[in-house]
Amino acid sequence: MMLRVLLVAILALAHGYVAPLGFARSSSPALRRRALAPLAQQPSTDDVKAAETNAEAEDGSGGLRQLLGLKGASAGDEKAFLNWKIRLQLTKPATWVPLIWGVACGAAASGNFHALWNLFGDAPTTDSVGVVATDAVKAFCAMVLAGPFMCGFTQTINDWFDRELDAINEPYRPIPSGAISELEVYSQIAFLLVGSIVVALQLDGWAGNDWPVITAIAAFGSFVAYIYSAPPLKLKANGWTGTYALGSSYIALPWWCGHAMFNAGSISAPEVVLTILYSIAGLGIAIVNDFKSIEGDRALGMNSLPVAFGIDTAKWICVASIDVTQLGVAAYLWAIGETWYAAVLAGLVLPQMFSQISFLQDPVNNDVKYQAAAQPFLVFGILTTALAVGHHTF
């Protein structure tokens, strides 16, 4: 039993970088009402998926899945103090991983982060254990802002606006199951939003930023999270705007936050451009998750790229946005003299392209396999780029 639970935890963390890009998406209330009526009257792929999801909790991992906000979670524990398990589930902790990683990449790109290995090596160093420990705590606090607060706010507000769709696909989720009240949801959204701004202000002060860069990033991220999920803009209803909003929120914004925590004044225009480009790769990751939900998206009026262009065209848009972005970044690093980093990044693209061979043959059934095989290389490619930026003098 313990081995099974441990395995679920490891898979959840590994899946965390791509899971956020595939969580529930829905259209306007009017479209949902029209679409959900026939779906509720007949067995659909979504109904089957929900049934399978609920059955997964029987393997003994339902409790852990609940805490991580994953499918197959067990029912809520009404005896939990302040309903904390349900509240935590609503923030989907498994989806915090990419933002935490983004903060780490931003810290690396700052060129001013003192890691543990700075205390060792052949070259003399003036770093002390105190400096290393302080920077570690700074990075951790920035990760708390990006993960529990900002991502938690995003997932909570997204679940609220997706509550009708979740009633079919994931009826055990906190909101459709009635495990948490409307007032409790509103209070959680308010707490996470206000908490994000307060924490960001404190981090700006700790970092010594003359202008509240981190607070501005937090405020902008909160705004993007709202217009992504809520009408009338509801960016997620459009394949292009929705997927790019996700990509930028999970790559560019936490990167900037991590950098600003250690050296806000050194954020250069080329670095901003690189992170925005990597957000295009994030768009490709998001498309991977859209292939299995084509029928549901079409019924709900969701104009995802596979719906808009068809599977054959969308799959090429997907891999092209991922590969061309990374190869373009590698070419840029080579051009500015960071040849070793460029070579490593190009090398990390190759296994991704190899995994895309089977994905392109059947993107509907090979999406999970592709994500598991390719995404780790993309993630380390982002870190490689960050290290190159930190090493280079612009």
Residue ranges and their predicted role:
Residues 11-13, 37-38, 151, 348:
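A composition/secondary-structure signal for short, hydrophobic, low-basic-content segments
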Residues 42-394:
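Multi-pass alpha-helical membrane architecture of UbiA-family
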Residues 1-31:
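N-terminal chloroplast transit peptides
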Residues 4, 32, 60-64:
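Short amphipathic alpha-helical segments that mediate assembly, nucleic-acid/protein binding
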Residues 19-55:
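N-terminal, immediately post-signal peptide pro-regions of secreted/luminal proteins
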